[in-house]
Amino acid sequence: MTANDFKALGIAVFTLSDTRTLETDRSGALLAEGLEAAGHRVLTRSILPDDLWQVRAALCAAIAERQVDVVVTTGATGITGRDIAPEAMEPLFDKALPGFGELFRHLSYDDIGASTIQSRATAGVAGGTLLFAVPGSTNACKMALEKILLGQLDLRTKPCNFAMLLDRLGER
């Protein structure tokens, strides 16, 4: 495989919500469908309650699964008491990727103005797996998918991308 080839990545999509179901979850569906349309394999898509320990357990299980290269969560990135995505995810990071949240908020500013500062979108690497947490709004998921994730999960994106680094993320 060369840097000009596409490589399908194994991806887990988790929606963090106490109110959504797989049938009503438009944001998780948008992410899963967009990733599959790009050629990736969505290995699991599920709804997780806004519970720190259940979310962290699901993240740990996905990280331990060798076929999962990437985990994308949607929801629970705000500032209310039930918004626990960063608290569940960030302690697992071997390396944080602060540029993801910075770029996400920068791009969101064009759509929602200064309200973007309420987003705690985050990303990092844990156990050789890429983890991304994006807000639950469908527009936020669409923007993150189209303007950040699809390019960074594609070997053909130049000058660099996350896909080309996957084999090296677990180096010690």
Model-derived regions, located:
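Non-catalytic beta/alpha edge segments that cap or flank active sites
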Residues: 1-172
